[in-house]
Each structure stands twice: as structure tokens, then as C-alpha cells.
Curated annotation (Swiss-Prot):
Cofactors required: Zn(2+)
GO biological process, one term: isoleucyl-tRNA aminoacylation
Keywords: Aminoacyl-tRNA synthetase, ATP-binding, Cytoplasm, Ligase, Metal-binding, Nucleotide-binding, Protein biosynthesis, Zinc
Gene expressing this chain: ileS
Motif 'HIGH' region: chain residues: 57-67
Motif ('KMSKS' region): 595-599
UniProt entry tagged with the keyword Ligase: yes
Protein name: Isoleucine--tRNA ligase
Documented EC number(s): 6.1.1.5
Amino acid sequence: MKLKDTLNLGKTEFPMRAGLPTKEPVWQKEWEDAKLYQRRQELNQGKPHFTLHDGPPYANGNIHVGHAMNKISKDIIVRSKSMSGFYAPFIPGWDTHGLPIEQVLSKQGVKRKEMDLVEYLKLCREYALSQVDKQREDFKRLGVSGDWENPYVTLTPDYEAAQIRVFGEMANKGYIYRGAKPVYWSWSSESALAEAEIEYHDLVSTSLYYANKVKDGKGVLDTDTYIVVWTTTPFTITASRGLTVGADIDYVLVQPAGEARKFVVAAELLTSLSEKFGWADVQVLETYRGQELNHIVTEHPWDTAVEELVILGDHVTTDSGTGIVHTAPGFGEDDYNVGIANNLEVAVTVDERGIMMKNAGPEFEGQFYEKVVPTVIEKLGNLLLAQEEISHSYPFDWRTKKPIIWRAVPQWFASVSKFRQEILDEIEKVKFHSEWGKVRLYNMIRDRGDWVISRQRAWGVPLPIFYAEDGTAIMVAETIEHVAQLFEEHGSSIWWERDAKDLLPEGFTHPGSPNGEFKKETDIMDVWFDSGSSWNGVVVNRPELTYPADLYLEGSDQYRGWFNSSLITSVANHGVAPYKQILSQGFALDGKGEKMSKSLGNTIAPSDVEKQFGAEILRLWVTSVDSSNDVRISMDILSQVSETYRKIRNTLRFLIANTSDFNPAQDTVAYDELRSVDKYMTIRFNQLVKTIRDAYADFEFLTIYKALVNFINVDLSAFYLDFAKDVVYIEGAKSLERRQMQTVFYDILVKITKLLTPILPHTAEEIWSYLEFEAEDFVQLSELPEAQTSANQEEILDTWAAFMDFRGQAQKALEEARNAKVIGKSLEAHLTVYPNEVVKTLLEAVNSNVAQLLIVSELTIAEEPTPEAALSFEDVAFTVERAAGEVCDRCRRIDPTTAERSYQAVICDHCASIVEENFADAVAEGFEEK
């Protein structure tokens, strides 16, 4: 036997290297085979419910890192709730209708307009489901736990039927109407868009300043007067039917030198416009209030058949332009509103593809709307006063990345104005985890217009509307519920497979159809109505969930998307918000803080992270950032997170190894019998437990990460475990001092493993597999630990906080001695302490082997005065010299009692007593050489 064999060196097969990329899939298969998700739900039956409703990602392509961050965050929350006494099932979902899938099929050579619609929709469905399968595997690879066998998918018959019923209730309440209002129109998608489908980019446009000649001045203006107009959309002049002025804006009638014509512009803009137009010596002839110009009639710049009426509008400002805007009711919301109020014609001169139509005039017909500027300039002739290129923020189709236009076309709308105040009242009841989120959603609802819900596409849920022979739209409870039942049984494709009469209830009649003939709507619903109905299709309809949901958690872009549409439909149907809390996240940016994009080559695929680091590192990264704001991610950042993971893993490995001979049922030492330092560490750990439990409850992942890393680095590695080897390795295997420390080790190990489970489930399960005395076969079936409080807790904490200050001062003294070459390692030191009464009392209260805590071989508490050479602090001073004696081959301390024993061992008296008591045979035979 060798002397080193008398040491209690930690033993474990728990590997230092995690091997996450290969081990994680093995664990995941084991969880699936064991039906772990189902077992957890069964275990929590009857407990308080917690419903985190999954916002459905769009089923197209592999997941990106933003998806991963979001789903991991949800998984951490659901797992922590499940381990905190809540019944918290998780139903993942997918959004599957819409233009992107049509675009994919088009790129694959599928020609929608050349094939049977039902066959085309079948191809869309097959593709969507293939993408669901792909993303399902992506999410499962992240270790996300949920009912993957029974997700919700927006194309399933039961979901589509639930969506129809949401629409039906809104129709019954009078919230659905048809109108020809201007809507966001995407010529690149050939469809109307909702606000949520718009994104803004800078666009360079040609702006024109031109003049309309007065035709009837109403006794205010002469007919040789021209009203100056500004536009950034020259194509809309073809549909201009009025000029709008601000009622309270001052306008001036002016005549520049050398100019026979007189012009009207906003007084405030005269100076800048004169410079722009090259006017000199401008004479102001008259000043008018805008309301005085109301109902003056002007000529259209070139269309003699059209008159343009001067009208009043609150949207007119003097921030730019001329203070007068031309008004084309068919091409703008403000234009439409003031145009309708003044009985102006709603002319639309651009078709669904962005091509100018016949009513624009023969010179324009057939041209793309963006290309007509030269023709407009030619038609304006000497009415054009100036042109310039401007860069401004402009709406784009978020899918095709092409600019859009406002265009008045017959569309179906969901009224928001009819119940806007109800929605705003409900927002006040929702808990937002960021105040700016509440303000953002509130302002969006307050300021938004009615919701255009119809789309001129194929792949989506049909609007369940019929038309009578006289054109009357039919959407009554009887017909809508019948359609819902048909969809529930056959899916929405039946809408296209059957004639209108076969989609109506048997024997249905309508006074507008004396001959019993009906037509059906061919538009589909906005996909935001699809996902915005999920509270009904999933939360209400799945018995394991509760409505309203406890939490919606998505990216901050969903304030205008899913948060918004879900809120509108839920309040419209039931008068309540669909969620009790909203938690939003920022976007994942690259390591430099730049937006990720394939074209820039700065994207990070979750699959690449899994191959290089493992999903655990991605999961740990999610907790290491403040995801309420935009966050950065790169392979370098993940490498740093991987180092943190390694530190956590190896610290827990040390605890596993040094409790391998510890049976908690037999060897646990009661708290009251622990040493003061062990009590202190127990209290500190319970503070960590409380911090983490509270942070899980508040979804504060970064708090968990910081607290955990700080505890492992500062409390454990830099202190408790730093001197632990002097106890757990050196003392007798069954000694009280060793069992005291092992009691703390084991308590921390078991509980910290549970605390880590929501974040690092693979690692937690691997650790758990080494804890043979724990009852649950999987740590995921256990509960998060509760924080315990102890007697005299504050007193103990105060004592050890003071000791930590003392320790820091002692370490400075040792460092100075090391720099002066007095000692090398701290174990070579004899530290003499010159305390005042406060420190003397402190060291007595610590009631521990202070030399052991400071990792020095000898420590003396001096009574004599402090020598001049001492390193002095306010309450204490230190001197350091080399310890007397020789190095003990067993404990490595320098000790005066170190000597060669008769059993061939050079050890100190303390080690000799341990060896002689516990290894009698080896003592009798003598130890082998090193």
C-alpha cells in the first residue's frame, strides 16, 4: 500500500469532458422512451395550472437562433413551473398558411394558375407539414420538452373550425364589414397586407412641386391664381380629386417678379419655397386662413374632365412641402377620409400588379407605377415648379422586401373602432414585464385603423361569407357555424371542392336570392387572423390548458403581430385579453451588434452550435444575456459561455467525487452539529436557492445565471472548496469533520442539480444518474428545492462576512510575502496575526481552524504589540515568515512534528494519528515507496 492510498481522493466516473454533441441525443431518446413529459404531467395533475401559450413560428425552413432563444426561454419557464408545484403542459404550435409557402412552390416550378386549386392547396399542405416535421426535430434537439406528438397546427380541421367560430362571433356582433377603403397593397404579392406585414426602409423617391389653376375662386381667388402642391407619389396625380389645406394654417397669395401668375402657398414656407423655385422679389398680395379657401375649385393639371376641390384636413402640416397636399382618395387613408367627407370620387388608377390602368389616361396605361415620373413631368409642363429626389422612410412588404402602395379595393375589415376602448381597458389589466411594452401595445391599439382581414391569395382559411343574387353579403350565425362544422369534418379545402349551395345548411333561403342561387367569397383570411385565433383553437379547446393563458412570450416585433391580433379577436369574442402576462424579447444580433443576414454571412445556425458545443451551451447562453433587449451571439461568445459551463460542470464533478462514499441516510450530520463554516455555507446556499426560485418565478434568467456563477466561483471555488481538500482528503474517511463537510457537499449537489434542471436538463440528468440514493429516476420528476432558514442565521452571516474581510487582508499579507520570496505557496507560511479586540472576538466566533481556512501551515494569534514590519490594517496586522518544520508527505503542510515513522512514512503527528487509527495493516507492514 502506498501512502497516497490513505488519502480520501475523490472517485467518480463522471467525466470532466461533457461530450454534449454526442450525449445529448442519447439523453433525449431516453426521455422520449420513458415518456418523461407525460409522466411529469401525470405527476402534477390536480395542482394549480400554469399555461404558457406557444406563439406559432412559421413552418418554413430550419429554425434560426431567434427561434432557439425563444423556445429555450419558454422551456426554462415551463420546466421551472412544473418543478415548482404547477400543472404546466406545453403545447407547441405552427403557423402554416400564407404567401411564403406559395412562393416556395413557385420557385419549385409549381404554376398555381395552371392547375386545379384543390391540388395546389394539397401541395401547400404537404409542404407545410414537411416543414413542421423539420422544425419539430430542430426544437427537440434543443432539449425542449412538450407534447410534440400532439402539437397545434393552423391547417388542421379542428383549428380551422375554431378560427371560423372566432370570425363568426365577430360577425354576429357587427364587427365585420366590407368597404373599399385604401389598404396597404403589395403589388409584388398581389394582395392586401395588414399593418403587421409591413416593415419600413429608406426609399429614394422623386418629389414634385406643381400648381393647379383656380377654376372657381368663390370670390376669394382670381382665375389667374395657382395653388402650389407637393407630392412624393407622382403616379397618384392621375387619381387626384382635391387639394387639402389646414383650416388654421395661414396661406399667402404671392407674385414673384417677372411672373404673370399668382400663387398660393403656406406663409410659413414662403421663404424656403421661393429659394427652391428661384423666385425673386416676391410680393405678398394677400393672406388667408385655410378655412377661407374651402370649396374653391381648381382644374386638374392635365385632365380637363376633372375638377379638384379645395377641402380642409387635420393631417396637413407645414413641416414640409407647400402646406397644401393633393388628395387622391383611392391612394391614401387620410385622402380617403377627407375625400369621403367631401364626396370626392374614389378613383383607383393602378391595378393589383402595380400597372397603370386605362382610367389613368392613354399616356399612362400599361406603365409600372414607379416608372411614370417622366410622363407626369411631361404632362405637367409649365405647371411643374420644381422636382427633387428625397430619401424617406417608406413601407415595404415584409416578405418580398418590395415597396407597397395604398390602394382602395373592396376588402373585408374587422372593426377595431367599435370596441377599441374595451381593448385598451384590457391592456391595463395585463402584467407587462417591461413598461415600454405596455405603452407600445397601448399606443398601437389606440392609433391603429380597422383591420383588413381579406387576402387575395389561395393558401389560407377561406372567409365564410356567401353572396345572394342581389349581391347582399351573407354571414349569419347559422351559415358560419355550418361552415365551421364542415371544416371540422373535412378541412377548409372543402370550400373549394363544393359549390356555394352545397356549403350552406340544407334548406337555407335568403330574400336576396329568390331563385335560390348563391356565390361564395374567394378571398382568404389574413394569416394574422389564423395565429390570432390560437387562444380559441388551442387554449380554449385543449382541456389541459386554461384561458386566458398565464403568459405569452415572443419577440418584441409581436406587439404589432401576434400580441395585437390575439388581443383584438379575444376581446371581440369574450371581452378579455387572451393573456395575463406578456414577456417580450429582443433580437439576436451578431457579435458586433449587427443584424444577422444570410447575405452578410453572419448568421449562426442552432445546428452548428449543437455540433460544436452542444445545445446546453445555447441554453446557458440564453440565461447569460438580458433578452428583454437585443442580444449578441457569436461562436466566440458561445466559447466564453462554454468555459462557464466547464467551470460549473467541474465544480459539481468535485462534489460528486467527494461524496462517493457518503450515504445521506446514514452519514448526514444535523445542522446544529455542523461547524460554523459549514453552517455559513449552508446559509449562503439557501440564499442562492431563494434567489433562483424567485428569479424563476419572475422569468429573470440573467439573475439566475449571475447568482449561480457567483456562488460557484466565489463561495465554492474561491473559498469553501479551496480549503476543502485539507478536510475531505486528509481526515479519516468517517471522521466527524469530513462528514460535516460532505453533508454540505451533498446538500448543495442534490439541490443545485435540481435548480439547474430547467436550464441544463441534459447535464442535470447526467449528474442525477450518479446520485444513487435519490428516489426519482429522473431529476426532471423532482421538485425545485425550497430555501431553508436557520437559527441565528443573520448572526452567522455577519460573522462570516467580517471573516471574509479579514481573510482578504490576510491574503494581501501572504501575497506581499510571496512577492518578497519569503514563501512560495501559502502552505509554506507561518502567519502571525496582531488583532484588536474586534478581530480577536471575530476569530473566536468563527470557532474553526483558521490556519486551515487560510491554507497556511501555521497561524499564531499574537498578544504582543504589532511590529513595525507588519502589514497593518485598521483592526489587524500581519507578519509572514516561513513555517518551521518539514513538509508532511501526506497533507503537504509544513509541521514541526513531521518525521519519518517506523512504517516508512514522513508525516506529521496529525496524519500519523489518522493513518495509525485507520490503516493498521499498512502500518504493520510498512508503506511502499512513493
